[in-house]
Amino acid sequence: MKHNLPADLVTLWRDSPGYESARSRTFNQRIPPELPYAIVRPKNMEQIQHAVQLAVDLDKQIRIRSGGHSLAGWTLCADSILIDLVDFRHLEYDATTAIASASPSATSAQLNDLLVPHGRFVPVGHCGDVGLGGFFLQGGMGLNCRSYGWACEYLVGVDLITADGEYKHCSESENADLFWAARGAGPEFPAIVTRFFIRTRPAAAKYEKSTFIWPVACSDAVVSWILKILPELHADIEPLVVSTIVPGLNVAAILVQFLVFLSTNETGAEKLGPSLTAMPDGTLMEFKGVPTSIQQEYVSQEGTMPRDSRYICDSVWFKDGIDFVTVTRRMFREFPRDRSMVYWEPKYPTSRRQLPDMAFSLQADQYLALFAIFEDSQQDEEQGIRIQEFIQEIEPYVLGTFAADGMPAVRKTQYWSAEVIERLYSVCQKWDPAHRLGCTLLDPTRKVKS
């Protein structure tokens, strides 16, 4: 036993066998160099409390890893205690209340698989291996977010361990300030979530996907068309637009995908058809009404964003009312290279809703992200600079950034509204006055360690 830790609590010190393998348990193979003081893998609540006490005794910062999908590498902080929840697992559905409960290490795919037999649905992430911890805490840009809302809005309660090791349950009526923060604080959340309680909604009976691909030179016409149809596009349709080098065609192209959520007797043509009447000519390929499922979409996504690659990502919320076609033209046409892509996910009409009282507070009609995807570590600097060059060009039109897809180490931006920043800082000061858990997005005087 070292530092009075239980013998059965897996604790890896820097000189322990398996330390580096545990440190590098991340989706992004572009792994930050920071070395945690120790990596702890608890299996139950008591062991999480022991890990927190270790950090308190040693006066170390704490980082939490759920699924390891953070592209920015939030979980790696020099000389910290990394609490990896990979072995702390819970996933359950209560049919009497239609409430699911899940540990942060459960993934989007696992939650979806749990709910499918019950005919229930939560707008889980677009990547199946995204851990629910980071997903919910950062707001949760889930499936058909534009209509079904942010995933964190589905939370009805949270169990957690505080920065000093106490268990708390949080809801709108109990420890409400922590519950407020759990819905959007992201890496600044001042406690360790151990269980989410999630309301569910009826699932679609079936899904269809329609995909259309144009040469990238047609981007103006395609983007204009999407902007035109958004106000009337059926609420059960999720549109995604990607500009990339399309495998097989080996040309830069702009791709539009519609995922249609259907009841038993509905067809995709009924819901999507009216929006296709003004579709631009000149497609390279069309795939209409292809039956699919969330599970199948996850398999497809694994091919687009595999675990064995290096990623650099930055994203923006655009100010509403700008000339979106003109502002994004060069991005759509010139950014695609190799496997890199421009990803546009319109958020209208949910972007016009008054959000519930929660920490997640920054949204706009248009969300866009740039992804550099590559294998060679020698390209790290070049790829990062290239993304920032494109971002700097559009900076005057930017409202802020989605915390899950940002580059805080290189670009200062807005992640929350000004009012929420002040309130969130107060909550963090109350529950984590030693700043063991925060990742520096709130206070610019604290060093960014990702």
Curated annotation (Swiss-Prot):
Cofactor(s) required for function per UniProt: FAD
Enzyme class: oxidoreductase
Coiled coil: none
Occurrences of domain FAD-binding PCMH-type (ranges): 32-203
Keywords for this protein: FAD, Flavoprotein, Oxidoreductase
Cell wall biogenesis/degradation in keyword set: no
Functional pathway: Secondary metabolite biosynthesis
SUPFAM superfamilies: FAD-binding/transporter-associated domain-like
Pfam families given in the database record: FAD_binding_4
Methyltransferase found in the keyword field: no
PROSITE patterns: FAD_PCMH
Gene3D superfamilies: 3.30.465.10, 3.40.462.20, Uridine Diphospho-n-acetylenolpyruvylglucosamine Reductase, domain 2 (3.30.43.10)
InterPro entries: FAD-bd_PCMH, FAD-bd_PCMH-like_sf, FAD-bd_PCMH_sub1, FAD-bd_PCMH_sub2, FAD-linked_Oxidoreductase, Oxid_FAD_bind_N
Top-level taxonomic group: Eukaryota
EC nos: 1.1.1.-
GO MF term list: FAD binding; oxidoreductase activity
Alphabetical list of PANTHER family matching this protein: BINDING OXIDOREDUCTASE, PUTATIVE (AFU_ORTHOLOGUE AFUA_1G17690)-RELATED, FAD-BINDING PCMH-TYPE DOMAIN-CONTAINING PROTEIN
Function: FAD-linked oxidoreductase; part of the gene cluster that mediates the biosynthesis of the indole diterpenes penitrems. The geranylgeranyl diphosphate (GGPP) synthase ptmG catalyzes the first step in penitrem biosynthesis via conversion of farnesyl pyrophosphate and isopentyl pyrophosphate into geranylgeranyl pyrophosphate (GGPP). Condensation of indole-3-glycerol phosphate with GGPP by the prenyl transferase ptmC then forms 3-geranylgeranylindole (3-GGI).
Family the UniProt entry places it in: Belongs to the oxygen-dependent FAD-linked oxidoreductase family.
Name of the protein this chain belongs to: FAD-linked oxidoreductase ptmO
Gene behind this protein: ptmO
